[in-house]
Amino acid sequence: MIETQSMPKPAATVESKSKLFQRITSIDILRALTMVLMIFVNDLWSLKNIPAWLEHVERGVDGIGLADVVFPAFLFIVGLSLPFAIDNRRKKGDSEGQLLMHVLTRTIALLVMGVFLVNGETINAAAMGMPKYLWYPLCCLSFILIWNVYPKTAKRSLVFIAKAVGIITLITLAIFYRGHHDDQITTFAPQWWGILGLIGWAYLASGLITVFSKNNFYIILGGWIFFALLSMVSHAGLLPHNNIISAIPDAIRGGTLAGLAMGGVLTSLIFQYYRKEKNNLGLTAVFLAFSAVLIGLSVITRPYWKLAKLGATPAWLFLCSAFTILAFLAIYWLADVKKKANWFNIIKPAGTDTLLCYLIPYFMYAIVNVTGAHLPEVLLTGGVGLLKSFLFALLCVLITGLLNRAGIKLKL
């Protein structure tokens, strides 16, 4: 039985603190693999004659493809990393107010990036005078200027100018933006917040609970149960319709996305506890049991609301959480227990600078559009096409690593 007091808290000694709160290799590797998969599945649109199970399942259909498990895995990993990040900041001396400000500023950054990227999907090139393939690199370059980790030796005036250029560029793009919806010209708006924006809202909910809970296992467990139940209540149409509830972003109000992130936080606390006890077999047993329960919950809820990413159903929440826990467990044994982390060195930049890696494809697609480059049909078809998309993902990781070495590294 796990007691509240014995759940992972900063240990009593400096030595045990350093062991408990060091960077976990398996989490970085899991994040890197997820990022590579995300780039890979996002490139599948360029291919034809590929297995349907690799792609997103259409809205309203009961089922998921590989592409439908990548985003929830990323949300889960956001939660998985949270206790380590918060504890490390506490070790550095951050107050509760500073921790809350950190969560809020990161949330705002993710929302800003998400909104700018999602507006690119509906841009009206004729009305704005700018094609989509120029909008994206301008936005991404601005993100880099604003959130790059500049060397301490850099002149403050130059850093200020770089950040100011990024901010002014984004403001200008937002002012002059023109999009389209149902044959109507639209202006800059949040829309559905985009992938990064949804991550931002889920991060806000799970981050605030993590900060206030101070690693209390039962508060975190209660938070996860709350969002899991909220997901079911929301899909059952039982949420009250009033201005207050409607004002809450759907990524939180719907329960599912925040539930994925909170599941990661809960898993992280369990992981910290058994790792501190050096009980890998106990950790394995608990993770397998937790995954089995989650799969069971997915099976139970699927007949009511289907298993679907588009709709963020409870069954999708439970099943994808189980998949991510099992993947994390396998990688932990391979990388941290068996010391085979070097097997994943080729994708390491995708785990340590994931945001920059996520932005690289926007530049790559822009280059292809500007140059008019076209690959032969054989490279866009079937198995050969899949290999092309996989190599494209690895190329994005390689570029991320090269940019890191050149001094470009993003941190929110």
For the regions a language model picked out, list residue spans one by one:
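Alpha-helical transmembrane segments and their immediate juxtamembrane cytosolic regions
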Residues: 2-412
